[in-house]
Amino acid sequence: MTTSTPTTSISSDLRPTVRNIDEARNMCHDFASVLTVGPERHEVSDFGHPDHKIVSFDDITVSYAGYRAPTFDHVREIVTWGQGRSNLLVHCHAGMSRSTSSAWGIAIANGFDPQEAYDLLRNNHPIERHRTWNPRPDATTIMRQRAFIPNELVLKHLEKFLGLRSGTLREIAANGSAIAPLDR
């Protein structure tokens, strides 16, 4: 994995925060703006946030009957709405795919270098407690970062929308996809 040292003078307030739907529900009022990517309006109607954008589509990379794949128009709507917003919370259901790719595109639109934006978002991704499978009561618990797996179709649309070479974001994601356990 390639990890860059942040070199930008761009305000860290312009780096979106990524969470899952349950975390977003609990902390949405700590943020100036909230972007829901994926879940339907009825799933987040209890947020009650005054600056809340909802863009609904399924977490798929090809079209299937009965499912909505992310489109170029979805991506344009996400980035256009999110660009320039400081203290932005971006979430989907699991906080792993639609939200990570959307936040990444917004960070790039805010002036972050694609690799730097990826590294910053990934390094600030939530830590989760995982219990290893063990039938005994002394099972081992490890801490590791939540999976950070940007939706490839969203990335493809982002590359086009942001004027990047085709494959740029998908290559960065493919080269930085390994997640190691933390020493905690």
Feature roles, as predicted:
Residues R76, H93-M96, Y118-L121:
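Recognition helices and adjacent regulatory flanks at domain boundaries
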Residues T2, T80-N87, G105-R184:
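PTP/DSP superfamily signal
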Residues P39-H42, D59-I60, G95-S97:
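Short, solvent-exposed loop/turn segments at secondary-structure junctions
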Residues V34, T71, V75, A147, ...:
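A structural signal for well-ordered alpha-helical scaffolds and beta->alpha junctions
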Residues L88-W104:
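A phosphate-binding catalytic loop at a beta-strand-loop-alpha-helix junction
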Residues T2-V55:
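Glycine-rich, flexible N-terminal cofactor/catalytic loop recognition
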